[in-house]
Amino acid sequence: MSFWIVIGILVAIGAWLIGVYNGLVGSRNQGQTAWSQIDVQLKRRHDLIPNLVQVVKDAMGYEQETLIKVIQARNAAVAASGNPAQAGPAEAALTVATRGLLGLVESYPQLKANENVKQLQEELTTTENKIAFARQFYNDSVNNYNTRRQSFPAVLAAASLGFGPMDLFTMPETEKEVPKVALR
């Protein structure tokens, strides 16, 4: 009789471990999928910026320092992609550099009237909005995973099953305001 009780307890523990493991895998996979959605939008942003720089380069001959800052920030952001902890600050620096460039574009009437510049500004704004939505979904997914991982009884098995914490995709406080792009 006690043999069957021990077997029953072992089966219950095994079933519990399987349930915890499968729940954590599902939550972690959702977070990884959400990050890949951010990655797609960041790549789109990284691809748009050289096009914008190329279009404005000729008209902004003596503003080379600004253009160089934008390209350097873009290259740093590309290098940080794939790592949420590094991507946040790198993308924030890219946002600052891009805002500086777009601010200078406003000073050049011929650029403000250029259809290519208008289209690139619009695409950049749309991409920024998509990044914001993807970042929110990712952070919600990571929060769900981390909460599940830290909740009882999963906390008893999560670390031993190889489930470490996931990083949120955060931006510095100075970058939390919406970018303003004038399309006139």
Please annotate each region the language model reported.
Residues M1-R184:
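A helix-centric hydrophobic-segment signal that preferentially recognizes long
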